[in-house]
Amino acid sequence: FQAEDGIRDRSPSRGLGDVYKRQLEKTAYKDKVAIFVTCYGNRNEPDVIEDLIAILKHNKIETKLVKQEKCCGMPKMELGDLESVESLKNFNIPQLMELVEDNYNIIAPIPSCVLMFKKELPLLFPDDESVQKVKNAFYDPFEFLMSLKKDGNLNTKFIKSLGEVAYHAPCHQRVQNIGPKTKDILELIPNTNITLIERCSGHNGTYAVKSEYHEISMKICKPVISKIETSNVDHYISDCPMAGHQIDNGVQNIEVRSESPFTLLREAYGI
């Protein structure tokens, strides 16, 4: 399927549509980014992709979606189906290589998908030169934003504080060894305090959605839930939306529910 279908089948939106395209044409770009939308971003929460696009546009980043993509292959790899992993790799990598050769950086909104292209595929296919080139061009979204800050190109004019925010750093992001880049970016917002939670949510890919394991997965999530419930937070977030919803299933004593860090950053920008 085409990555655009899931979000463009919707009515014209803040991030996409003719107005958005015209605005981009007038922008003096500082860099180029292609978004690997992912299965989840395309079909489950396209609003999150729109928030990410709005943030990039606000920072004068030329932005496009990967024209065609299939699943990154992480779910198949976790099931040991390496034949399907290779088949998906053989479809996705040529699409991404076209962007790499056109000097695009590539990001994805789901940590598992970022990990697949940055770590897992390069380990599985060490002799595939294209896989290695895609790896070198692939970034976590907040890792990319932090690179803008280091170069003095990140827009830090925020108009809204976020208050107290509990931030769950998902496992598939932590093993990328990039540091808490989401926390680092959000802490640039005035009057915003980020409490970092580095514990497994228990979701673990498809583990938590299987009836025989769901109860165990919620027990794994209990320390995260307890920390959030006792922290008097205005918001709680996770880079992994599945982890966020897993936490939602357990919290009882507070009214707030999980949000995307892209959504909060967009709110802070007032865009």
List each model region and its residues:
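Short, exposed "boundary/linker" segments that immediately precede the start
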Residues: Q2-D9
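Iron-sulfur cluster-binding electron-transfer modules in prokaryotic oxidoreductases
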Residues: R8, R14, D18-I271
